[in-house]
């Protein structure tokens, strides 16, 4: 990898559910309070990546998490940084290890020496979501949504709240990022 020409990201996906908007409501004792809820099975999948060096967060909505959308998100990151090599740290989801992702890496890295690869993917420790700073971003957004449940009258508004929580702070100073930084001194 050439110095100054590498971007490193932690990447993950998140499923936002209509039920994530649930909060608490006060009502008279021994009286049932009814709150209208539309389809409780509604969901939106988001892919996100945090730049290890700047803390900038990139968010994109997709229909679901699978190999196709994983590759679509990787291509999105490539378009943002066309002249840089990308290093992606992520969990061991099946669609991160097989199928379309493998085909994509073979295509973009074809004929290149390993140190010249355009995209390098590194798996985090298995069953250790606490290692991925993107999980902290998801938690922040999923905490924000029920804190504002009074305006979450539709799933569209739930999604808007989720995105607003992330976009209100597009640069994340996750303490976990520091443990992955390499000292240049």
Q: What positions do the PLM features span?
A:
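Short functional hotspots at interaction and active-site rims
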Residues: 1-185
